[in-house]
Amino acid sequence: MARRYLFEFEKPLVELEQQIEQIRELARDSEVDVSQQLLQLETLAARRREEIFQALTPAEKIQVARHPHRPSTLDFIQMFCDDWVELHGDRRGSDDQALVGGVGRIGKRSVLLIGHQKGRDTKENVARNFGMATPGGYRKALRLMDHADRFRLPILTFIDTPGAYAGLLAEEQGQGEAIAVNLREMFRLRVPVIATVIGEGGSGGALGIGVADRLLMFEHSVYTVASPEACASILWRDAAKAPEAAAALKITGPDLLNLGVVDEVLPEPAGGNNWAPLQAGEVLREAIERHLDELLGLKVNQLREARYRKFRAMGRVLDPSSSETGLPA
């Protein structure tokens, strides 16, 4: 049995999985009928896995969001997009591999798709810069969004980054300016924009393609202003305090839904999207098509106004004695 990537909180399942594999080998090598015993163990393992993943802490959800086999932007595109054509370059001499984009069809509907792309192993992660886009990546994304706006193509973005690349060269090339321009221009787009946090949604790197009419996120994805490790280092001068920081930052789907930051939290199979990627793809496609049907019925001025109001409603400062919730109506 090939060893799979295990989280510490999944260790209680190891013994059960070993028993299941032993029974499968026994069934292959003998005439003994073990189907009933195998079914019982598989049912027990599935139930325990579901119990474990329903009780994950914010710090544990971060681990799931960073799983190396979690479906990536290109994985989702291959699952539900027809006639995908990747488009390259920012027309300023750069073609960032940490942020990919192109045109394709979902059913009969043509769309533009943009997303962060991590690697599966060290070599690929180095090539993709661990999903941390450079200024060239955000300028490429803006070029493609301008293209979509011109040809009236709905825009779908997939967020999965620990943050924008913060190296010296990125700063020299105007990382902050590139992200800021994207924020400004995305508010002006005349087409529907749907963003989905498929893994990590970290800081300005996520916001650079995250100004959307609908913001979705998967159940075990995270969306945060800073990584818990960075937050703990800043506040407590101790990265070991990351679990406490993760809880305080309100980075999980239910918290963000309650705060009015995200519009829908998409369910994941027990074990996370890496456990059943095709099922995750079906869930995401259904949600995208449903929200597109709603947004395409709006006029351009209605779309822009709703997008503006959505973001203006975030981050209100309230008087402690006020009975207001600060949530959008």
Swiss-Prot record:
SUPFAM superfamilies, alphabetized: ClpP/crotonase
EC code(s) of this entry: 2.1.3.15
A molecular-function term among this protein's GO annotations: acetyl-CoA carboxylase activity
Domain annotation CoA carboxyltransferase C-terminal: ranges: 40-294
UniProt pathway: Lipid metabolism; malonyl-CoA biosynthesis; malonyl-CoA from acetyl-CoA: step 1/1
InterPro entries on file: Acetyl_CoA_COase_a_su, ClpP/crotonase-like_dom_sf, COA_CT_C
UniProt catalytic activity: N(6)-carboxybiotinyl-L-lysyl-[protein] + acetyl-CoA = N(6)-biotinyl-L-lysyl-[protein] + malonyl-CoA
UniProt-annotated location(s): Cytoplasm
Name this polypeptide is given: Acetyl-coenzyme A carboxylase carboxyl transferase subunit alpha
Annotated organism of origin: Prochlorococcus marinus (strain MIT 9313)
